[in-house]
């Protein structure tokens, strides 16, 4: 078996049972991985030098094909309502078949780290069948120094073989695609999908399981730091403005997607970014756009024209086009991946019902309520004339990656907020003056002004009113922002329609929260919007 590249000889991939391979490439850098990718016909080059790969039928994650091993260790700690179980026996059989399938193949190994905090990191070894997958994950996780690689010992292993097709009957799975996670042995097997995001989210899932037991809060969020060292955390589902609003030229970007919060402050789990590129432009997002125009970046499912120019407006393969690049491709990114204790937490929502104010201050109990709710609203497709928005609730702002019960994360968040006296804000980047189809999108200028006032501390001195529907505190006046926009009801021409819409949204919150009622105390229950409606 031919082995090339720097690695710890005492911890080769044979320790994972992988033997009789034709070749193993350890820790290759971008240039070598480009050569191997092109040699094997896995991807193309863009005119600017990015590596452009297509993932075939899977252009996103396959959450319905993800399984967690249910054993004596995970039985009482995993939220089984949200995680599909797999027996240890089925996993063992799958693992043996993965090892058999790999024989005679070339494999690529990247020895990486998840977590910028030395006390709360995991050494994650990622073994891939595709060379471009190796570059992708190298871009996204934290890369150890060349010296550290010689003594690197993996704590977690991911084996990604897209050519492996699972037999549903043999393993008790759903389709030919499988993502099997053994949290006890820290082994992840990915088969039957070429979508690279599965590898990244597997490390996130492992950290989301391991860290709460150490009192560290894992978060699906972006984070940045101001010139005075004040850290801000941004929670938000897709389409709420998390990436856009945390990419602030006056602040240092800590990371765009996954972080931990522990005794030393906030730290990035990753060493790179995985940004959406659909309709990306140099004018709207210059920093992200610049990363797509250079060597080393991986473009996923981006369409190229005959001159190999990327067309970011072309969504014919998928709307979920992406680019993966190291964090240091962003000019004002943190070199350490670490920030202090957060001063502000921002929970972003895009309320397409037009009911919520552009900003509200939350108590720790209200913050836990809205964190567990994880609300935003998607706009329905207009091709059939459907203009009714659709409410989306994804608990902890990232339900698919949370192995434990949401209340564990919620209680930990609330404890840390109280302990460090963090100011919490709910920011609505959705609609004002009416619901989607009637009102207009919240002006980004107003959102940025409100955010700036929250982050510099001046908003704390404003006069607040209590919102009659949600019970949180809303500023009455903020310099540089029209007063009317701060009171959503006043922006609606039809006040009766507003009240009806507000009641409808409140009812959705209440109905969604029923599953958490037995897991929270009275203070959090009292943060529910329905309580306020009843008290009116």
Swiss-Prot record:
Q: Which Gene3D superfamilies match?
A: 3.90.228.20, Phosphoenolpyruvate Carboxykinase, domain 1, Phosphoenolpyruvate Carboxykinase, domain 2
**Species name for this entry?**
Brucella canis (strain ATCC 23365 / NCTC 10854 / RM-666)
Might you give the EC number(s) for this enzyme?
Answer: 4.1.1.49
Family of the protein in this entry: Belongs to the phosphoenolpyruvate carboxykinase (ATP) family.
Q: What is this protein called?
A: Phosphoenolpyruvate carboxykinase (ATP)
- What residues does Mn(2+) bind to? 201, 220, 257
Binding-site residues, ATP: 201, 220, 236-244, 285, 322, 447
Cofactor details (free text): Binds 1 Mn(2+) ion per subunit.
**Pfam families named among the record's database cross-references:** PEPCK_ATP (PF01293)
């Amino acid at each position: 078996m031919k082995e090339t590249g720097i690695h710890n000889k005492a911890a080769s991939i044979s320790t994972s049972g992988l033997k009789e391979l034709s070749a193993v490439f350890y820790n290759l850098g971008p240039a070598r991985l480009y050569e191997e990718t092109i040699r094997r016909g896995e991807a193309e080059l863009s005119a600017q030098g990015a590596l452009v790969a297509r993932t075939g039928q899977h252009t996103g994650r396959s959450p319905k094909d993800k399984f967690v091993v249910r054993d004596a260790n995970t039985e009482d700690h995993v939220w089984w309502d949200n995680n599909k179980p797999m027996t240890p026996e089925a996993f063992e059989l799958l693992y043996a078949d993965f090892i058999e399938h790999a024989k005679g193949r070339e494999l690529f190994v990247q020895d990486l780290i998840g977590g910028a905090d030395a006390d709360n990191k995991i050494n994650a070894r990622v073994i891939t069948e595709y060379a471009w997958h190796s570059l992708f994950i190298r871009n996204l996780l934290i890369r150890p120094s060349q010296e550290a690689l010689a003594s690197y010992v993996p704590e977690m292993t991911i084996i990604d073989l897209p050519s492996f097709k699972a037999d549903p009957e043999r393993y008790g799975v759903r389709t030919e695609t499988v993502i099997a996670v053994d949290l006890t042995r820290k082994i992840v097997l990915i088969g039957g999908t070429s979508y690279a995001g599965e590898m990244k989210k597997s490390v996130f899932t492992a950290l989301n399981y391991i860290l709460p037991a150490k009192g560290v809060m894992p978060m699906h969020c972006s984070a940045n730091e101001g010139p005075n060292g004040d850290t801000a955390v941004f929670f938000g589902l897709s389409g709420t403005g998390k990436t856009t609003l945390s990419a602030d030229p006056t602040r240092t970007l800590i990371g765009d997607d996954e972080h931990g919060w522990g005794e030393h402050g906030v730290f990035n789990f990753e060493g790179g970014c995985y940004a959406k590129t659909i309709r990306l432009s140099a004018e709207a997002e210059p920093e992200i756009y610049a990363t797509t125009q250079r060597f080393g970046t991986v473009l996923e499912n981006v369409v190229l024209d005959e001159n190999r120019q990327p067309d970011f407006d072309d969504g014919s393969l998928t709307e979920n086009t992406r680019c993966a690049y190291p964090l240091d491709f962003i000019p004002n990114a943190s070199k350490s991946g670490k920030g202090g204790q957060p001063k502000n937490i921002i929970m972003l929502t895009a309320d397409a019902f037009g009911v919520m104010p552009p900003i509200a201050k939350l108590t720790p109990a209200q913050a836990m309520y809205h964190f567990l709710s994880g609300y935003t609203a998607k706009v329905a497709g207009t091709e059939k004339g459907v203009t009714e928005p659709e409410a989306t609730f994804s608990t902890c702002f990232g339900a698919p990656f949370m192995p434990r019960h949401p209340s564990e994360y919620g209680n930990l968040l609330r404890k840390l907020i109280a302990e460090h006296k963090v100011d919490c804000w709910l920011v609505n980047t959705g609609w004002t003056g009416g619901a989607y189809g009637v009102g207009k999108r919240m002006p980004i200028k107003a959102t940025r002004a409100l955010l700036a006032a929250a982050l510099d501390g001046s908003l704390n001195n404003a006069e607040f009113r209590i919102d009659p529907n949600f019970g949180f505190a809303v500023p009455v006046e903020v310099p540089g922002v029209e007063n009317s926009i701060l009171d959503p009801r006043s922006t609606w021409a039809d006040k009766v329609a507003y009240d009806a819409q507000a009641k409808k949204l409140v009812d959705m919150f209440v109905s969604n929260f029923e599953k958490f009622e037995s897991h929270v105390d009275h203070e959090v229950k009292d943060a529910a919007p329905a309580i306020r409606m009843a008290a009116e």
